[in-house]
């Protein structure tokens, strides 16, 4: 059988699609909001989304907090901020969705800060 060569971008897109379906199915079954992380080279965003109601419950980003970039220190601030907003609305347990990115660097820093602030995932 002929081996198919996928580009790195195509592989990442397929992996992200698989993970999105898996996370969404888990969230619908568990009735928990999803903490969705999005990052670029310059900034990092975190949103708390309820897929059952299709609404964003809370959001935080390095842009909203007027931080100059999305480095690890600023990712920690975003993680603590989103956790504070989630706890204020009564959500202690969430499902973590990193959008196919590796759990490393800024993603890990944001997740650790959210856990330290009281979120469970």
Curated annotation (Swiss-Prot):
NCBIfam families: L18_bact. Pfam families: Ribosomal_L18p (PF00861). GO terms for biological process: translation. One of its GO terms (cellular component) is cytosolic large ribosomal subunit. Belongs to the universal ribosomal protein uL18 family. GO terms for molecular function: 5S rRNA binding; structural constituent of ribosome. It comes from Ureaplasma urealyticum serovar 10 (strain ATCC 33699 / Western). This is Large ribosomal subunit protein uL18. PANTHER family: 39S RIBOSOMAL PROTEIN L18, MITOCHONDRIAL, LARGE RIBOSOMAL SUBUNIT PROTEIN UL18M. This is one of the proteins that bind and probably mediate the attachment of the 5S RNA into the large ribosomal subunit, where it forms part of the central protuberance. Keywords: Ribonucleoprotein, Ribosomal protein, RNA-binding, rRNA-binding.
